[in-house]
From Swiss-Prot:
Protein name, UniProt field: D-xylulose reductase
Classification via CDD domains: sorbitol_DH (cd05285)
InterPro entries recorded: ADH-like_C (IPR013149), ADH-like_N (IPR013154), ADH_Zn_CS (IPR002328), GroES-like_sf (IPR011032), NAD(P)-bd_dom_sf (IPR036291), PKS_ER (IPR020843), SDH-like (IPR045306)
Alphabetized PROSITE patterns for the sequence: ADH_ZINC (PS00059)
Organism, as annotated: Scheffersomyces stipitis (strain ATCC 58785 / CBS 6054 / NBRC 10063 / NRRL Y-11545) (Yeast)
Highest taxon listed in the record's lineage: Eukaryota
Gene for this chain: XYL2
GO biological process, one term: sorbitol catabolic process
A GO MF term: D-xylulose reductase activity
Binding annotation for NAD(+): G183, A184, G185, P186, V187, G188
């Protein structure tokens, strides 16, 4: 059997390097990918620090990682769209093909979803494998080939970019819209970038940290920024050049941001809740009703969101990074070898200035 070095979360505060047998092709449409780049997600840190996110509770060891890209090293006999040597972005959640959610086009809501590095609560069943390993097996249709001018590093950003794609699609972001994005972490910055590529006339990013707001401007994701410590909805609209946002993408889950978003949004606007809260939050339901707003919950990503995300990178970088409208690569602030992966997790957990941290796959 081929060895498969992996990074494993055993329990809270306990990460170790382990070696398992590599997965093998078992279905005609299976593809074996050698993982090359993996990003650290906030959910990884929640499991590392707290052992749970909502109803997902860590009860047994779990291979970490779900933001990954790699190179195809083996394909099943029925695979037609990929070949050995292709670079791919890995979509890490596999639904049941028989679920009503899958059949209705909402496979991200499938109750039987096997999502990489997310605990399986079923007794006696292993956790779905994460992608922070050397080899990862996936169905062909949950891999998206990367164009030649889209790097493997960008491939690892496809997963969080797809979260932004899903949010903008739910909010029907289109030409002429004025979009307010709350939160300038990786998801918020990428959501802002997506809104801009979808044709929004203005995108204002809201946060309480000036260095994060500067990043939003520096990478080209925001036309305007606003530090919410400096005022409320009137000040936000003033900072937006007098434009009232008709779409809000709320990426923090923080109660003050939700309230400010509802206060600032135009009557009849579209409010997309992307961020999760640690616990219950109060919601300004009266203002929401009187403005006749439409609320969307946004969870991960769905059909064609990955392809859309890869398409955004394809178009953005078709003339090289120096001519790219949005400098997504600037979001990658830290890079680590696989042998130093635990150090990378500790850095991100400590909140020491990392925007997006990437880890190389095992050699």
């Amino acid at each position: 059997m081929t060895a498969n070095p992996s990074l494993v979360l055993n329990k809270i505060d306990d990460i170790s390097f382990e070696t398992y047998d590599a997965p093998e092709i078992s279905e005609p449409t299976d593809v074996l990918v050698q993982v090359k780049k993996t990003g650290i997600c906030g959910s990884d840190i929640h499991f590392y620090a707290h052992g749970r996110i909502g109803n997902f509770v860590l009860t047994k060891p779990m291979v970490l990682g779900h933001e990954s890209a790699g190179t195809v090293v083996q394909v099943g006999k029925g695979v037609t769209s990929l070949k050995v040597g292709d670079n791919v972005a890995i979509e890490p959640g596999i639904p049941s093909r028989f679920s009503d959610e899958y059949k209705s086009g909402h496979y991200n809501l499938c109750p039987h979803m096997a999502f990489a590095a997310t605990p399986n609560s079923k007794e006696g069943e292993p956790n779905p494998p994460g992608t922070l390993c050397k080899y990862f097996k996936s169905p062909e249709d949950f891999l998206v080939k990367l164009p030649d001018h889209v790097s493997l590093e960008l491939g690892a950003l496809v997963e969080p970019l797809s979260v932004g794609v899903h949010a903008s699609k739910l909010g029907s972001v289109a030409f002429g819209d004025y979009v307010a994005v709350f939160g300038a972490g990786p998801v918020g910055l990428l959501a802002a970038a997506v809104a801009k590529t979808f044709g929004a006339k203005g995108v204002i990013v809201v946060d309480i940290f000036d260095n994060k707001l500067k990043m939003a401007k520096d990478i080209g994701a925001a036309t305007h920024t606003f530090n919410s410590k400096t005022g409320g909805s009137e000040e936000l609209i003033k900072a937006f050049g007098g434009n009232v946002p008709n779409v809000v993408l709320e990426c923090t889950g923080a109660e003050p941001c939700i309230k400010l978003g509802v206060d600032a949004i135009a009557p009849g606007g579209r409010f997309v809740q992307v961020g999760n809260a640690a616990g219950p939050v109060s919601f300004p339901i009266t203002v929401f009703a009187m403005k006749e707003l439409t609320l969307f919950g946004s969870f991960r990503y769905g059909f064609n969101d990955y392809k859309t995300a890869v398409g955004i990178f394809d178009t953005n970088y078709q003339n090289g990074r120096e001519n790219a409208p949005i400098d997504f690569e600037q979001l990658i602030t830290h890079r680590y070898k696989f042998k130093d992966a635990i150090e990378a997790y500790d850095l991100v957990r400590a909140g020491k200035g990392a925007v997006k941290c990437l880890i190389d796959g095992p050699e």
